Structures are given as structure tokens and as C-alpha cells.
């Protein structure tokens, strides 16, 4: 207890200069396939009610009374017995398939449903990797200063008597601060009719000293903005309300560019080799973003015309492609991006379907390899606002991006951690989507898995992998050098049957055919452990190199923040147990959720962060690891797992701490 | 002589704070129909040579040697006898028609030619009203500060080693002053290829702190810009060189919107009554401007991509239409334009075909009735830079726009002068185009006409009308009340045969069928004189009202500047003689040419004038005449012509003074 208290005080101190952190609580997530809509709904709400405000349409003759039997959905998560009405209206086969009536299905835990009967694998790919676990940096309402503001105005009729221009009438209404008010052409095009229609009682939509639109007065409180996380594999869109800074809706989809290459390197190759390559990739991502937008807006009952602002963050290549800028310079000497500055453009110019005057902010970057996503992460961590405390940040995706430092000095490096941490190159690895084991614990002699969407497991994602290896290390099934050992007496005997010797090498059976989603066994192979060792070794070596360069030891690290596909869900203890993180106090490790979108949302909600991001890009120092002898030595040294003599039983406690 | 000297000193004093005035001398104008190209060429140059740099193509097999007989043109101006080669290669009928060989025709006086044999009336409409008389405000080279600048740069290869972005490399090349350099998306799109192609030795095209393009180094000296005068009836485009501020080419055409109404009022009506009316008028003017641009550029051997800037000035309605902004508010209470501020937009956004990054500056206006054309005129007059001297400006077109004052206080008013001054509502009136009598003098008992294009007269334009009435007043043929009197003994007896009594009213025969272009007589009717009296009475009353309001007399006026269709060409003496101007000293009256385009060119060439124009719009005070008793009384009083006892013989001298 005492320790907890200390921690809290410490945290409060740390955050004193930052907006307070707050984890959104209450409610459960409903993931609606194939649209991959993620809805935050009240516990116990029916699926029918939850879908009322979305553009997902269910058939119905009875209007949700449970009598027509038409509002069929397929529940993919574990589900209790059917209701009497469902037994009457659905046949046996349907009930066994998980078919239920939306109006009779109440949601008490996170749930995945499909609104189409045919469950196509392709549709399953469109899965949210991030928002089933939502922790974003909370901004107290008084600190909100969104990029877009609205002012309800009644233009005095006197003002209009003497041939005053429409724009000048609005300037007068806004007061002398807006003497230099400007307006883009498309706002001016519709201004006279709109003023007439509203009889000069309306709402001015403002971006700095620029009028974007004139709306009816009832629109004054409809203030929303979007952020986009331009991930290489997954795109995430979030809708924020400016009234209280809350996240209203989240949607994500697989980045359609994946068809042209799974990673940045293969997409750069595609662009170099195809004359229209850049334009085709640009169109793919723009289409994806437009679809996300349409999901987000319909789930909140909004229209395209209601959105005047979006902020996008991604790696340098993704941001370049979105803007139609050639990223090929990033891949070749002298490794020049076209642009590192942040850019504010008309959203329509880029192809985004929002209000015609809407603006798109695209994050600044440091270089071709330090993108807007990493800067967003730094913003989210509050490191720029810390003078005295050293913060370590890890963005654990395909690359491991690391930063270490404070507002005084901030270093970054990039390690080619390899795709293992995203579940790739792992026998039964998968990205963090419904069906992926995302967490593992060992309690009372048995393994327990947390599976995304509460369905039976299909495979394992990065966070599950790290957890599992940590558990097996604790159980003594994996040794310090990474070997999966044959069953040993006295060591986790309940798991002995899961150690399978195949051609002289031991693999670990995570789920038997009976336990798995598609009746195929799920293994952790010896090779998988080796992949993980490579990945975690590179990251640990990167951290150590930065620590040396800044001249600190493990004890000097004040906070550790995790982000990225893995970083969001991994148990802090596991990262320390496998030696990915140095042996810091567990309590200083925190996941920042989807840090790219959170950083972008900070800018959306508090405009001064745009300037902070630009300064940050100038401020940070990049450390190139590839040619450093110290890094290579640390890398070899950190391939092994650290010694630790924790008893398996204590792991569960640690992991829920 | 002494007087001249005084005048010069006085002028220099007046201009001490202004760029010096300079009238372009040397060379002659060649007007090429049906393209209506106006070329300023060296005296004695052949038509063939003159057309080499244009996009007008002549047939030829001999390459201008005078042997193939294919380069036929029709000379509309007076022309001397054909050359021997022409006699051999052309037949009698052709020679009589004015057909000549371009390569054998040398131009010694302003000349109008047609490159098509069929002379269609429609093509004749495309006539320049302004530039056959070119007096623009000259800006000394050291004072040039054009809206667009270019800098030849060699980006150091060192700079490129460390992953610097393309834009940052250019920032470094430009020096610390350009730390905040921005670039529009379409510039960034092509930047990497262009940097590669030029091997980082190139030319930065800059608009303030914005990079518009990266060109090859040889483009560094190709610096040009356009101005557009958006006249209700005529559009004028001018191409300026930023190297020395000189006017490189001029083109004009009838405003195609005239098909939808001759004046502003009828176009506003068209827009109100047709849902697509605004868009169709906008397209018409944009097409016209694109055609003018293409003429201007081809005559200077330039391409669309060479032009990064255009400045447009017109009345408020014309500017609104060009921008696609509804002007209907201007016509109805509360007489609100959409916008009075000056606007800088991407030229392509408006539909102008220039470089994709090119900008269009559209002049600020004061109100629906005081447009960018009048502000341009004020800028041109230098009134804003005058603290002590009162300047009177008259823009004499369909409306008479008047300003009076100095940099301390500046009043304007608008008089519905009526269309007489533009040659409309006059029996044989026409706008100032080839065939219009634009000047009249009386020497040695005979009338002499100056006809635009040096052809036989077809009619009379505003300046000719004012001149003619002034002459007839001096001759005693028109009396103080405006009556054309029957022949009187001892009064201009050489003209007696021209006074024709028709149904009890006297008309004046300006040109007999033999003297006229199309064998039809050209008259000045009694009714025409009445129209002129109405127009000049309104203007004179407007001037007097402003003088009263500012509290000055005629002797306090330091300079009088004339602009507009009429103001450009009218003889100052005539304006005083008919009482349009108060009886100021003749030497202080000066025509400022096409003041709308000159004001726009000041902004193009010296960017601080953009700010000046904005301040001017705020500064000027408008005096509404329609409800003022004093104006109405002055109007009635000034319908008559002033008494004066000048002898006819002295008129010629006065007019050439
Ligand atoms: S809507 Fe009719 S049963 Fe659900
Ligand atoms: S070009 Fe052959 S005669 Fe003129």
C-alpha cells in the first residue's frame, strides 16, 4: 500500500506540468464486422441499440421487439445460451453457429459480432489493432484550445445597412481581434446565401483568423475533429469532440497499401518501379481514410460537412505518400525526404472527403526515419515538458523506435527489431486482431490466455508472445539461452504435456485443435523464441547505447512509456523478464496506447502543441546505431534472457499489478 | 517657355515622392486582326518580321524573300503604293482591297492589318481600347520589388549528405532569412525530380517566403508577370518584365460577358434570373483572360509555366464574378458585396491557365460601387503619397467615378454619367476601336480627325465627341445652351455645308459617305449633344459637390488625372471647354492611360503597393450624391456649356499643348 501511495505522489509530481492522465473507464467495446466498427457502448446495451446510430443496417419488421426474427447477427465471441425468443425464431444450426438476434443480445463484455452470415477471412483482416485498449492522454476541459473554434453570432441589422461586405459584417460581429479575418474562396462562394438563410444569426467556424464556414446557430455546439494514425499495416481514425476532448468513435482498417508490399521498403520499391506507383498508393490510403471517416461520422450521427479539421501522423514515408510527395529519396543516399516541416493543406486537395474548407495538418518529421508517429509519441509522453526527469520511450512495431532524455536533451535511435514483435515471422504469429492471444498468465498450474474479441485463439500476436515467453522463462521451460527444454521433474508439471518434441527440437503447444478457433493447433516453436531473442536483443542494445551516450544508469530512468502495436498491450513485467527493458521498477512502466493518434489528438485539441511538435523535430538528436561498435557488442550480449529466480506463481500477481 | 519650365519644376516637386512618370516613346503600334494583337515594333520594321515572335502564322514558301507571294495580309490603315514585287505577285483586285505581302510591308505609322482575307465585323469587335496610347507610370529599376522574385542557387553538396529534406536544402541555400520557407503541395510534388534534374544548381521562384518552383538556372532572368484590367466591356491584359518594369506586350478583347448584358446592371439581372448564371459569366471571363494570356505569352516567346503571378483589377462586380462570388448583393439593399478585402488565391483555383503554383492577386475594393479599378486609378495618381496637394481624378467610363483630395483626406463619388462618354446612345457613337474618331481639331478653317488605326472613320467615340463639341462651341456652331445653330455669317464658314437641317433640327455632318469607311455618313445630332450635356453636367456637379465638401475652390486643385475609356484620349482643353472639368490651368491635366491596369502593375512591380491599396480602401470616404440637394442644383446649373470667347484658331494649339 505504501508503495502505491508513493507511486501516486510521484506520478502526480511528474504530471504536474502536464495535462493529467486519465484512462477512460466504463462501458465495453463492440466490434462490428465486416465494417470493423468499434463502438464504445454501455454495459448491458443491446447490439440493436448500439447499431441504431451507425450506418450498419439490420433487417427488421418488428422494430426491435424480438418478434420478427430478422435482425440476425453472428456473435464471434463467447456467448451465453439463447433467449426464449431466439429459440423460437432461430433454428438449431443457426444457434450453434452463434447466430443471434441483435435486439435480444445484450453486451456485458467486449464482443465481436458479424452482420454478414458468410464470414470471409478477408473481412477479418479489417481488424482494429489498437483501440480495444484505450488509454489516451486526457486534457482537462479548461485547457482545451482546439484547432477549430466556433462562435455563435447575431450580426446586428444596423451593421448591414451601409453596404458592408458579408465578410466585414462577420468581422464586426467577432470583434476587433478579428480585423484581419480571411476566408478561403469556397467559403466566400456560399457565404451570401448562408447569411441570407440564417438571417444573419449563425455560427462562425474559425481556424485561427480564417473563416471556414457560416452555419446555423444550432451547429455551434457540434464541434468535432479527426485524427488519423497512418500505420504501415493499419490505419486508425478517431473522432474527437471539442466540447470535452473526449474520443467519440474509433475505426481502423488494414492499410490497403499492404497489397503493394507489407512494409515501407517494399512500398518504396513499388513506387520506384512503377511510374504511377506513388499515385496508386496515395489513392489507396486516401480511400481507406475516407472509409474510416465515413464509419466514424455515421457512428456519431455526423456528416462530412461537419468536419473542418483532421490531423494525420505516420512515419515519414506514409506521410509523404498521403501528400503525394515522392518518398523515394528517403531510401537512397543522400536519404532526403522532400519535406520535414509540418504541413497544413486543404483536406480536399489531398482527396479527403470532409467539409470543402476543411484543413489537414500533417505532422512534422525529423528525417526520413524519424517520422510524425515518433514525434507524436514524444508529445504524448510529455517528455518535452520535463526538465528534470529522464524518460524512456519505446515504439515497438516492425522497427523499434527508441527515445531517451528530457526537455534538456533528447536522443533517439532506430533498431531493426524485426517483425517478430508484430507477430510476423512467428509460426502462428498474427497481428493483434480478433482471435489473437494478446496476453498470457500462469495461475494455479494452468496457462490462461486473453484473446482479442473473447473468441477462441487463432494465433498469437506480439504482446502474447512476449508474455508467453516470460511465463515459460519463469516456469523454467525456456532457459536463459532461449532453449525450450524437455519436461523436467518438479518444473511446471501441469504444462509437460504441452512440450512437444518435433525432430529433436522442442516446441510448446499453446492451443490444441480442440482449444483453437479453427481446430488447428497453435504452437510456439524454438525458432519463434530465436526470432524474439533477436528482436529484444536489438532493442535492449539500443536502449543501453542511448543510456551510455546520455551518461545514465537504469536507476536514473524516471518513466518508461510503451507504444506501438506491441507496446500497447504487453505486460510491463514480461518486457522486463525477457530483458527487452532494463530492470526498472515495474511501476514506472506505462503503455500510452496508440501514441501516434494520441499525439495527433493533442495537437487537435490544444493547438500550441503544433508548435511544440515543430520545435521537437529540431530539438531531438538522432543516434545512428548501424555503424557503432558498442551497439553491436550490446546486441550480442542482450540476446540471452536475463537471470531471474522469480517463482511462477508470482507472475500472475505481477502481471495484474 | 518660362511657363513650361515652371511646370516641369512643379511636376518634379509633385513626383518627388513618387516613382517618376515616363511616357514610352519610340516605335509604332501594329494591330493584328482578327487576333487583336497589339505589337509595339520599331519604326520601319516589316509586318513579316513583327509577326515572327508571335503565334500568328503566315503562309510562306520563300521565307520572307518576297518571291512566293503567299504571305498575304490585308492592310486596313492608309497605305502607300505597292512594291514592284507586290505588283507582280498580287492581282489588281487584291491591291485595291489593300492586300499586301507581309514581308514587303514596312510599318512607319500605327497600322491595323488583318491576317484573314474575310474581314468579319465580329472580329472587329475584338479591338484594343486602350493601348494604342500608352502612358504608364514608370518605375525606376532600383525601386522594383516585384511580387515574385527569383534566386539562382547552387546547393552545396555537403548540405545534401545528411538526410536533409529537399525543402530544407533550399532554405539553407537561400540563407537564414528564409528559415520559415514554405511551399505549396504542387511545388513539393515535383521538387525531388527537379532537384535531381538540375543537379541542385537551379533557380528558386519565390513569393514572399513561399517557394513556388525550382527551375533550371537559365530561367533565373526570365521574370514576368501579368496584369488584367477587368473592364465591363473590354478586357485588357498586359505582360510586364520584372527586369526593368517594362510593358512587354498588351492584348485586349471584348468582354464575352457582353453577350449576357452590356452593362453591370443587366449582368446582375442575368445572374439573379439564371441558376447557373454566375458560373456561366465566370467561365466567359476566365476563357477571355486565358486567351489574352496565350496571346501575350506567345508574342513574347513565353509559356504558361513561365508566369507565376497575375494582378487583376476591375469594378466590384467584375472582380466578384471572376472569383465566382455572387455579386447580387451589390444590387439590392443592403448593397453588400461578399468581400471588400483584396484576395490572393491560387490562379488555377480560379481557372486561369498559368504555372500550377501561380498566384492571382485581386484588388481590394471600397464597396459595391467603388471597385478595384478606381483604387488602381488612385494608386496610379499617387494621391496617397501626397500630403499637401489636392488631386482630382476622373474615371470617365459608363459611370463617372470621381475622387478629390490628398493623403490627408480623400473623397469619392460616383455619377451616373450615362453611356454617352463611351460612345453609346450617340447616333454614330462607338467604343474606342479601329475606325473611331478619337480626336478632332480645327485648323485653317478645316476639321481634322484622328481615327484609331489610321483608317477612314466609321463613327465617333467618347473622346472624339468631347473634342468635336468643344470645337463646335469654339466655332460658334453650338451655342451655350447646346443648340446646333443654323449657319451664321462670319462663323466658321468652311463648315456651313456640314450643318444639315433635318425636320427642323440641325445635325452636324462629321463625315460624308465619301469620307467614311463604309460609305455611310457620320453625323453628330442635336440629340447627341443633349446626351453629352447630361453626362458632363453630372460629372461637373459631382466635382463641385466634392470641392464644397472638402472646402476648396478650383484654384486649389493641384493636379487633374483622367482615366477610363474616355479619359485616356480626350484632349484636356476640350474637357474644360465643354465644362466637364472646372476651369483649371490646362497644364495640370494629364491622362493616366489605362489606370486600372497601371495601378495593378504598380502592385505587381512594387509589392508594398498591395498594402497601400488595402489602406486606401479603408481611408477613402464615399459621398453618396443621389440624395443631395446641392448635387441636384449643380447638375441643373452645369448642363449648359460655359461661356468662353476663345477663337477657333487657337484650339489646335491648345490641343497639342
Ligand atoms: S428486430 Fe425483429 S427480432 Fe430483432
Ligand atoms: S513570304 Fe514569300 S512573299 Fe512574303
What are these regions (language model features)?
Chain A
Residues 2-20, 25-28, 89-227, 232, ...:
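Nucleotide/phosphate-binding catalytic cleft detector across ATP-hydrolyzing
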